[in-house]
Amino acid sequence: MSDTGSTATKAKTAAIVSGYFSPLHVGHLDMIEGAAELADEVFVIVNNNAQQEIKKGKVIIDEADRLRVVLSLQAVDHAIVAIDEDRTVSASLAQLAETFTDYSLIFANGGDRIPDFVPEAATCEEHGIELVFGVGGNEKADSSSRINVELGLEDAQSAPPSATT
């Protein structure tokens, strides 16, 4: 049985954000700063190299470098590289919930995520993690894929349609 807890019974609240951060851009900063407004602390899951290969076809910026950049941000209290082997961060969310049992956790999603399809929803429900949407704004401020396509680091065919417009 999982401990779903409530904000009233936990000592602290942490908002969890996830992303590739390859490269980090203003939309990521908006999301992280928005998460900081929701909770006492901000935890970041940096998608791993295998996930980057699944999404983009190659590693553009190594996971250790992306983690280091994220950890340097003033608003970030804790960051990990994802342990997942697919494009979700379900296993990483479960790991954080099992590690930080004294926290009420929020999975903060940016403007490009919608409640209708969140692959991590079942994990959040199982571990009592609240889902929040529109963190940092309801519109996507920028796209790592757009930046990478313009720099010639990512093929336009592999990028999501919104990244090339």
Range-by-range predicted roles:
Residues 1-165:
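Nucleotidyltransferase catalytic core that binds NTPs
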